[in-house]
Amino acid sequence: MRANVLKRKLTLRIKRKKRIRAKISGCENFPRISVFKSNRTLYIQAIDDVKAVTLAAVDGRKLGVKANKEGAKKIAAEFAKTLKVKKIEQAVFDRNGYVYHGVIAALAESLRENGIRL
């Protein structure tokens, strides 16, 4: 029973992800910021969909932070620094099918606080 529930949740998240990706895309000056959340850490990257290139990425494991709100704020601050070095000040936020609540919302708000317009 539990396996079916987890499989259904994953299936629904992937459907949301595809629906979102059909509507948004990024370019070099206005990249798509994609978030992946695992049980232990967060991954965030800026993607140019026109050239299919990752412009910048931050891995939560390398920073030694957990996948909670405090960790999301630290990752977002580091990612904002990386984007500012590359002179990227605005982007499209791709929540990757996750609900905009908790860790994902904290990450987006921290990016905004650090000067990235989403």
Curated annotation (Swiss-Prot):
Keywords: Ribonucleoprotein, Ribosomal protein, RNA-binding, rRNA-binding. GO terms for molecular function: 5S rRNA binding; structural constituent of ribosome. NCBIfam families: L18_bact. Belongs to the universal ribosomal protein uL18 family. Part of the 50S ribosomal subunit; part of the 5S rRNA/L5/L18/L25 subcomplex. Contacts the 5S and 23S rRNAs. This is one of the proteins that bind and probably mediate the attachment of the 5S RNA into the large ribosomal subunit, where it forms part of the central protuberance. This is Large ribosomal subunit protein uL18. It comes from Campylobacter jejuni subsp. jejuni serotype O:2 (strain ATCC 700819 / NCTC 11168).
